[in-house]
Amino acid sequence: MRGMPQRPPFLGCVVASTLLAASTLILRAQAPSGPPAWAYGVAPAGSQPAGRAAGGGSGATPADDGLPKHLEGSTQAFTLAQVRDGFNVADWYPGDHPEAPAIVMKGRAPSVRACGFCHLANGKGRPENAGISGLPVAYFVQQIADFRNDARKSAETRKTNTALMTAIAKPMTDDEIKAAAEYFAAIPSTPWIRVVETATVPRTRIAGGMFVPLDGAETEPIGARIIEVPEHPDRTDLRDPRSGFVAYAPVGSIKRGEALVITGGGRTLACGTCHGADLKGLGPVPGLAGRSPSYQVRQLYDMKAGTRRGPWSDLMKAVVANLTDDDLVAIGAYLASK
């Protein structure tokens, strides 16, 4: 109505979340059944992992031979030791991103690793961590605060880089956090993951929290999992920020996830209420479209399990309360496909 004050979009999200919280007192919440190992990049409890590899699908982490490596389309050259230096990011494609602040490319030795080392200079990230390009500044700053305050922990204790992120965040200065937040917010989030529905997946090794296909053509049933692997393992091993990932998902999961995301499916709140109709964010609320399904599922599970807390995470408690593990798989597959 003309002359009436307009309610900020984020306030509508808070109201909707509060109403949903009330409804969960009536619906019986689904108790967590244990962290889904696949989402955390660890072997299922009691199983024997196939092995470890850094890339290419076989053997241990290759030793540095001292020879410069090259990537197609790049004029840069780096040795493996340089690629693996957490305080001097191997910037393969400097023209792909804005001028980066020191905290992104160099970090601050000895305790603050460069943001771009794990999350890449363009912020696209990898399945074992998070894509952070395009995140709203306020959201980014709050998440670092949550790490510093020990509010963001993993429900899967073997997910060691969650503790590493906490250790990195604690000594960061406010200026460093602001510089990183503004830098990554200025880089749009673009497609990085190809979702393929299938009944079988390549057999894999676990490499630093990421699945890497074994050499050969061995396959296994996908089960109730999403298996996210590098499109080009050798390039991923060189931390190529242009080489994306393929996410294998169970047949039918995208359509089922669409129903849950768009309508809530009687179990939850429609994601677009808070994250925008296009799922690309709304004000300070982050976008979900096209982001890693492994990351998104483990975050939803952490919120459900109560290990990821903080002022904005608390708004998600009622949203995830009634979601089953199969629901999480479907939601992760659909969001990644957008």
Features from the language model and the residues they span:
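Extended intrinsically disordered, low-complexity coil regions enriched in Ser, Thr, Gly, Ala
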Residues: 133-162, 289-300, 305-313
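Cys/His-rich metal-chelating microdomains
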Residues: 121, 277
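N-terminal secretory signal peptides that target proteins for export/translocation
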Residues: 1-12
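Flexible coil segments in periplasmic/lumen-exposed cytochrome c-class electron-transfer proteins
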Residues: 30-113, 117, 152-270, 305-338
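Acidic, glycine-rich low-complexity segments
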Residues: 273
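Short cysteine/histidine-rich zinc-coordinating motifs and their immediately flanking basic loops
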Residues: 126-132, 283-289
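Bacterial N-terminal signal peptides
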Residues: 12-24
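Sec/Tat signal peptide C-region and signal peptidase I cleavage site
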Residues: 25-29
